[in-house]
Amino acid sequence: GGSCGQCRVEVHSGGGDILPTEEGHINKREAKSGCRLACQVAVKQDMEIEVEDEIFGVQQWECEVISNDNQATFIKELKLQIPNGESVPFKAGGYIQIEAPAHHVKYKDFDIDEQYKGDWNHFGFFDVESKVDEPTLRAYSMANYPEEEGIIMLNVRIATPPPGRLHLPAGKMSSFIFSLKEGDKVTISGPFGEFFAKETDNEMVFIGGGAGMAPMRSHIFDQLKRLQSKRKMSFWYGARSKREMFYEDDYNGLAADNDNFQWHVALSDPQPEDNWEGMTGFIHNVLFEEYLKDHEAPEDCEY
């Protein structure tokens, strides 16, 4: 427990002092106001706590895996089917929690697209195994937006052991997710979230990299497709090389159909075969140098 940091509550009385397992998720100011992780608070006396209203709307669903395909070398798009007649009433930028039972998975059994197997072999990752003796819970942002109904779509990056140190534990949940195949059953709960767009006319600047694509896609699709927003917006995405880029067709289509939207990619390690003539470097630096440095009012943008 205490690893995901998602079960925050306000403890007004009782509960004792904050534990070391909470300090990585709760700063001193938050701790002073009574913020705690519910999973770490032992109930030994009468307590007064406050939880966010949204918690009372949380539900649980048993979903079925529709697909679980590579989008990049170490990123999969997990698409889940919600039970017929039901829906997850989430907002763009929201997240769900996904449950994994105790399990023992072998990386050699993963379905990895042929174009990515070279890197997996190079680092010896197909020799890795992940054994988990108790149920595990983790949070993932939705990549789909609310009008993509009946499904939940996640972008999941696998947390492998560091290359050359394969004896170290692999990511419990990401290893489980990479092992999922079409037709498998998965339990999720939600919706949760606070990373929501404000209802203003301010310019929107989206910044992401890797599996951080998920909430960006949800937000941008929601703004342009559901809300048909005319706000000026741009998406700045960072990838290692051209092979690690994904959803290109989606964003190219949005840019073609919406004059108020642009998207930009910077590669941090372009390969010779990429023949890349675009921007290079880390995306936060590129955003500053190429745009925000000369922006007339960057403080007015919503990020």
UniProtKB/Swiss-Prot annotation:
Known catalytic reactions: a ubiquinone + n Na(+)(in) + NADH + H(+) = a ubiquinol + n Na(+)(out) + NAD(+)
Alphabetic keyword roster: 2Fe-2S, Cell inner membrane, Cell membrane, FAD, Flavoprotein, Ion transport, Iron, Iron-sulfur, Membrane, Metal-binding, NAD, Sodium, Sodium transport, Translocase, Transport, Ubiquinone
Pfam families attached to this UniProt entry: FAD_binding_6, NAD_binding_1
A cellular-component GO term for this protein: plasma membrane
Domain (2Fe-2S ferredoxin-type): residue spans on this chain: 1-45
Family stated for the protein in its record: Belongs to the NqrF family.
Keyword ATP-binding (UniProt): no
GO molecular function list: 2 iron, 2 sulfur cluster binding; metal ion binding; oxidoreductase activity, acting on NAD(P)H, quinone or similar compound as acceptor
Subunit note: Composed of six subunits; NqrA, NqrB, NqrC, NqrD, NqrE and NqrF.
UniProt: [2Fe-2S] cluster binding residues: 4, 7, 39
Cofactor note: Binds 1 [2Fe-2S] cluster.
Primary residence: membrane
A biological process from GO: sodium ion transport
Record-listed E.C. numbers: 7.2.1.1
Organism: Colwellia psychrerythraea
InterPro entries in UniProt: 2Fe-2S_ferredoxin-like_sf, 2Fe-2S_ferredoxin-type, Beta-grasp_dom_sf, Cbr1-like_FAD-bd_dom, FAD-bd_FR_type, FNR_nucleotide-bd, NqrF, OxRdtase_FAD/NAD-bd
Lineage: Bacteria, Pseudomonadati, Pseudomonadota, Gammaproteobacteria, Alteromonadales
Start and end residues of each FAD-binding FR-type domain: 58-198
Protein name: Na(+)-translocating NADH-quinone reductase subunit F
